[in-house]
Amino acid sequence: MTIKEAITNADSLQNNNFNQPMKIKWLSELEEKIMNEQFATHETLNEYEMRDWILYIRNMFLPLYTDDEETKENLEWDFDENTELLAPLEYQGMYTTYLLSKYALHSGEYERYSIFENKFSTEYQNFCNYINRTYKPLQKNKIEVS
């Protein structure tokens, strides 16, 4: 699923006045969450390459764990409508639900937001469970013998 497809799905379910760059920003925030919480903490497929504190994936550089504000500000985000989203097909519904929750939150529809946010949380947890079942956690522990 591409960013454009996720946005089209969400827009077909709920009319809204949010512009395309805002929707892309929301989806990029979710992708960053997925990478920081899942891909950075698990062994990944060959197409994912770790480089110090930056993850290079599908022609994008994305930050992992960093507290350096200057570094965060200087990173260029290269998300456009044709960017493929990370989740496998069976978990891609969470992108639509995530956008619907953002639409409701920023429109002041807090009851709808609560419903969509709960649904998104369940879908995201199912995706996390899939990652945990499929990939081994990164092992950074060491035993030193004196």
Predicted regions and their residues:
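Short conserved catalytic/interaction loops centered on acidic-Pro-aromatic/His motifs
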Residues: 108-117
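Short, positively charged, low-complexity/disordered linker segments
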Residues: 87-89, 104, 108-109
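Short, hydrophobic/amphipathic alpha-helical patches that form generic packing surfaces
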Residues: 93-105
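Generic detector of ordered secondary-structure context
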Residues: 22, 91-92, 112
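Structural motif
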Residues: 83-93
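Generic structural signal for hydrophobic core residues of well-folded globular domains
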Residues: 34, 38, 102-107
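Conserved short "hinge" loops at termini or chain/domain junctions
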Residues: 1-84, 122-146
